[in-house]
Amino acid sequence: DKINYLDREEIWAADETQVYYLDTAMEYSPPMACGRDMADRILEMEREGWDALCIRADTPEDGDSILQNNAHLARLPVVFLSDHPAALEAALRAYHGRAIVDSRSALDPRELGRIAARYGAVVL
């Protein structure tokens, strides 16, 4: 697997409708917990002017919450933060697009890179 670590020449993320070219100085929103209804929080983070939405995935079920109820609302790149391999994989699998994986995770960097590479995500 090719690990997609920061490539300063061409860093991008995408969702179903947009491609986002990323800047190394971008600021993530404070991590928000996954839940069935994140609409108000997502809209609040966008109004506050964050460059990307940081979503904390703590359980594999969080991936279902992202896909079923909230993914269509985000108009910013999505960053997943997780300290649990199964939760991170579920979130990346559920997300329709190329996500960012937050390198501040407590996971071993090699494991984080392998999981991100499996789903085409970029680690920043």
List where the protein language model places each region.
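Domain-level signal for soluble alpha/beta catalytic cores
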Residues: D1-L124
